[in-house]
Amino acid sequence: MSQPSTAPVPPAGPRVPEALHRRRWAVLGVLMLSLLIVVLDNSILNVAVKTIAAPAPTGIGATQSELEWSINSYTLVFAGLLFTSGLLGDRLGRKKVLLFGITVFGIGSALAALSGSPGELIAYRAVMGLGAAFVMPATLAVLMNVFERDEQPKAIGIWAGSVGLAIAVGPITGGILLEHFWWGSIFLVNVPVVLLALALMLWLVPDSRDPDPGRIDIPGVLLSVVGLVLLVYGIIRGGELADFTDVTVLAPVLGGLAVLVVFVLHERRSDHPAIDMSYFRKPAFSAAVAAIALVFFALMGVTFFSAFYLQSVRGYSALESGLLILPLAVAQMVFAPRARLVVERFGARAVCTGGMLLVAAGLAAFAFFEADTPVWVLEVVFFLQGAGMAHIMPPVTVSIMQALPREKAGSGSAINNTFRQVGGALGVAVLGSVLSSTYRGEIEGHLGGVPAALRDTAGESVEATLAVAAKLGPAGKDLVGPAYTAFLDAMHVTAIASAAIGLAGAVVVALFLPGRAPGGAGGTGAAAGAAAAPTSDETPTPAQTG
């Protein structure tokens, strides 16, 4: 187990121009709005999956696989370009990259709203992923350049809390829109918010860049894009097939890993690397990165099937489902901005371990949910999950971002988001395949009376089974009960797997994150920062701001 670091903390003297310092909270508000747009859209989509799966004119008749790809096409492009966007932000200017990203995201949203088929929706979601890849790293990178080091934990906590706000607003907004408008309105609603964000960015957000970026590492950029795209595609393909031994899965996964190994070797030998690999040798930094990947692995898979549990099994509407998830968001909004105070008292190790255990407990609770579980139990579980997340994300994000010089904030943010997205993609794919394969195994014995042409479709998901049952009329009534039972059994198995991943994350942070530093300073702002940040002789020069 690691010991609290006593290495010197980089000087935290005045580095932000006074005029910019005075408007730092207004800038943070604009950054939160930009982040809100991106996260809100994904949380809306989780509530809308049932509607999109319905036949036209209600939806577009998307299959379970197409629903997953409407999420995963976004993830594939997003994860593949995160390193590149962070690097470009450090070199070209973070404000420019942010403006580009939010504009592309708005265009993609408008196109997605007008999609006439699942294929078009998947393509336009990829465009949205392209825009988001340039937004999320830039928001955190700008934050690191407008706040002094001692205020960064507080600002990051508020920034992380905005994710909770998006989680709260998204499903409720989606439910209201779906009850009154067509399904495309969940994307069209982004457009006016994007226009507002663009106006505020032009007015308030300063530009900043690395004053001495060196030559752009073109081979490194290309290797990172190819490696990440291949890896994430293979993961997604494995989840789609529910078989990770298929050659169409192994080839891209192994190919992606091989390219990423070449990327790491290249970065270690380059005199102008896109990512300084030496940071990964620091236990606190690597543990923080691993924690992000593991917690999103566990949560993203559960988030995907919870919408089906609430709407298909429990019979709640999209709006009601959004309201039921509200405690998770409220907990994040309440606790994330205050997480730094708990870290200062108990240290990052204890706080993040406790957060991971809360998340794991919440995930394990799904293994006991039935069709008639009291609503108050669901609310308590969602609140515990949100409280756990609120005590994980701010401390580990601070550990990652304060490990790098301010001039490399874009790269640090890209690392943060890349591991989150790869972890999330793994969660949807692996846990999604566990859910689908378990469901098919449970329901197959009840499909004997289903016409052969519909049998394969009926075993795809609970929504597909219920749709086939409706087509069969009175003859399909006998499928409804077994479909609910099969889904609940599959959800229980998947929940146990998710909780195990959450426990693995707790072990990682307990072993490697720094504990409470002598004198009462917490692990992220002091111990973690010292353990992972440049020492005094490596203190970077101020970034250019304007």
Question: What residue ranges belong to the model's regions?
Answer:
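C-terminal module of multi-pass small-molecule transporters
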Residues: 81, 92-102, 116-120, 138-139, ...
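Cytosolic juxtamembrane N-terminal segment immediately preceding the first transmembrane helix
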Residues: 1-38
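Transmembrane alpha-helical cores of Major Facilitator Superfamily
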Residues: 36, 72, 76, 103, ...
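Hydrophobic transmembrane architecture of multi-pass small-molecule transporters
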Residues: 10-13, 17, 196, 399, ...
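C-terminal membrane-cytosol helix-exit motif in multi-pass small-molecule transporters
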Residues: 192-209, 227-236, 255-269, 506-513
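Helix-loop-helix hairpins in multi-pass membrane proteins, especially solute transporters
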Residues: 87-220, 224, 237, 322, ...
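Transmembrane core module of solute transporters
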Residues: 27-77, 182, 219-220, 233, ...
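Small-residue-rich packing faces within the transmembrane alpha-helices of Major Facilitator Superfamily
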Residues: 79, 106-107, 130, 191-198, ...
